[in-house]
């Protein structure tokens, strides 16, 4: 009886010690993970009066003209929100990433849609070798025609997509900011694909963005289709997100 009791006590003590060890290990891991997190947030604004966006005549494609009858579409070269935030600005890390972070490809597969005779989104950013889908949500054919720089790592392609056909997969082989995209059937359709290495984002209607990066020293670059690129250096400390705001001058 005593032998069984002794065995029970020893086993219980060992399990208790193991439990405390696992708890300590877990807490240590959580603390390390929390300390290793960082990030860069910011807002991009336009100083001055934004240029007038021209209305788009879609009368040659009745389906699209009807779809936008109550809310006519304009160009999207400079879109400013109610608080001055600049939409459709690509933000990325141009310096400071180590080789592992720069080569990491997100598992997410974004979609470049053709809807209402517009490219949705107007501007998309993605990583080198990150796959994306091209879809057609309209009841008529479209033609997607990206125009990367000649003799660069990316190759021009031109593909029609009839209504009801499934999305097709594409990928870009090298960095390029940014690749213009047009539709040969509907000449008013324009957009951009920015291809980078590492974390990237496109600003929302408030001009806001977030880049998830580990602690370190970085150069953050913003690119806008009308106003071009701006850069600034930031330092991200462990557990303390950094801020990188940009302001473009209207012209």
Where are the regions that the model predicts?
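Extracytoplasmic copper-binding redox domains, predominantly the cupredoxin/blue-copper superfamily
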Residues: 24-251
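Generic alpha-helix initiation/capping and coil-helix boundary signal
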Residues: 4-5, 18, 35
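Domain-scale selection of a single, long terminal region
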Residues: 2, 19-27
């Amino acid at each position: 009886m005593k032998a069984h009791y002794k065995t029970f006590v020893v086993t219980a003590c060992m399990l208790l010690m193991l439990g405390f060890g696992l708890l300590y290990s877990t807490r240590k891991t959580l603390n390390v993970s929390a300390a290793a997190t960082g990030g860069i947030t910011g807002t991009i604004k336009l100083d001055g009066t934004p240029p007038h966006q021209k209305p788009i005549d879609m009368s040659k494609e009745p389906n699209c003209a009807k779809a936008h009858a109550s809310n006519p579409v304009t160009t999207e070269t400079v879109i400013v929100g109610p608080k001055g935030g600049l939409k459709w600005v690509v933000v990325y890390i141009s310096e400071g990433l180590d080789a592992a972070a720069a080569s990491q490809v997100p598992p997410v597969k974004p979609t470049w849609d053709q809807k209402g005779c517009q490219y949705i989104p107007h501007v998309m950013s993605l990583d080198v070798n990150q796959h994306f889908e091209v879809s057609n949500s309209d009841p008529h054919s479209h033609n997607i025609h990206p125009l990367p720089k000649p003799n660069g790592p990316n190759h021009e392609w031109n593909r029609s997509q009839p209504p009801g056909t499934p999305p097709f997969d594409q990928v870009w082989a090298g960095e390029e900011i940014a690749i213009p995209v047009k539709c040969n059937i509907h000449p008013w359709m324009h957009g951009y694909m920015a291809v980078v290495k590492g974390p990237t984002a496109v600003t929302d209607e408030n001009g806001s963005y977030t880049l998830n990066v580990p602690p370190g020293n970085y150069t953050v670059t913003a690119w806008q289709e009308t106003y071009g690129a701006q850069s600034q250096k930031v330092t991200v400390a462990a557990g303390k997100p950094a801020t990188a705001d940009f302001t473009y001058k209207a012209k």
